[in-house]
Structure formats: structure tokens, C-alpha cells
Amino acid sequence: ARELWNAGIIYGFGTDSDFPPQEALRRELAALGQFFSDQETFAILTKNAALAARRDDALGTLDRGKFADILILDGDPLTDIENVFNIRIVIKTGRIVVDNR
């Protein structure tokens, strides 16, 4: 996996697991963590997933003109990827749909 990444292969994240969603994500993150840094894993979960789905024109990064469903986390996933589970607020289509403040 590391050799392919270093050669420029783009990994994107996705799962069709029959585990409950959060458990599936934890397993995927554990597997990714064996080969990639937290910053690389975050890119795999976001912009690379959009690239893999050929939706990077509208998804994957916070840029003008793109859809911006946003998670506000209690912690920085770039320093500890497990922080993706510490969800404080979810904003979807401009509305707060989860508020754990």
C-alpha cells in the first residue's frame, strides 16, 4: 500500500460492510493506520474519496462552489484520526442536523 501511494496511486475511502457504520469505519481506520499517517488518512476519507467517485468537482474539499456538508469535531483529526468520532455539530445543506454542544 505504501509503495503504491508513494508511486502516486490515489486511495479513496468507501465501505459496503455489514457492520454498523461506526464500527466499520473504526475497522477501516485501523487498517489505514497501518500504512498511512493521520493526515494521509484524512485525505483518503475526504478529497480522495471524492476523486474515486469522480465527484471531486462538487465534493471532498471546502472550496467555493462545492457542497459543504460539514462536521465540527471536538479534536483535530489531522493529529489523531480517531477524533472523527468526536462529533459536536453536523451541518447538512446549511442546517444543523446534529448538535452535541
Residue ranges and their predicted role:
Residues 90:
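Short aromatic-centered micro-motifs
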